[in-house]
Amino acid sequence: MKTIIIMGNGPSLRKIDFNEIRKYDSFGLNAAYRVYKKLNFYPTYFGSYDCNINNKHKENFESLIKEDNSIKRFFLIGNYELKQNLYGKDIVMNERFQKINFSNARNNKLSGSFNEFNDFGSSGANAVQTAILMGYKKI
């Protein structure tokens, strides 16, 4: 049974031994991408389920998708108005970009697929839900 570690981007991240994290699949969130190059660490997956963060970091998220790194898949919801179309067609069509039909309405029911993805209210909770959809049991 594979394990995945969900990582936020708060100050506690500074105390993490990334050599230990490398032993597992990992999921990075939001603005944590800013330290990946410096640490020579990229998570297995990366996402942002916050529309404001998607708006603010759009260009950087697009660059992260385009660059050569070990991130297998990106989970970016876009913004309220454009949803994932916030990103350019080349990004949305990228094989590492996960299509998500994100419901802005808060719903505590676990999603059955990315076609009807319920908002659990935080990026961390939505990353856990994403890991479950990908088949992870140890989160």
Predicted segments — roles?
Residues 1-26:
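N-terminal glycine-/serine-/threonine-rich phosphate-binding loop
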Residues 22-25, 31-132:
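Acidic/Gly/His-enriched mid-domain segments of enzyme catalytic cores or analogous surface patches
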Residues 134-139:
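Glycine-rich phosphate/pyrophosphate-binding loops
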